[in-house]
Amino acid sequence: MIAGTERFTFGTRGKGTYEITQEVQACVDRAGLEQGTATIFVRHTSCSLVLFENADPSARTDLHGYFDRLVPEDAPYFVHTYEGPDDMPSHIRMALTRSSEVIP
């Protein structure tokens, strides 16, 4: 079995969803393999990976709205607010999603 590791960083403009398909595909292409799996992992505690519809931008809008209602910022019941009003909601959203994906 052949295995390789490649790491890339991805800058953001703050809270939101970001398309990283091209970056992941470039890593796979550089590996030069015809078949296998890619494991994608994010190292930040308030960041997650979601495999999601990207053809219609309204799908992202709905996802954002759902999480905003499910885990609102500035909720009076959050105790962990030292790093700002969005920090605890970000951690909860990550716990409800995933920090890694394995893609064939």
Predicted features along the sequence, with ranges:
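Active-site histidine-anchored catalytic micro-motif
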Residues: M1-P104
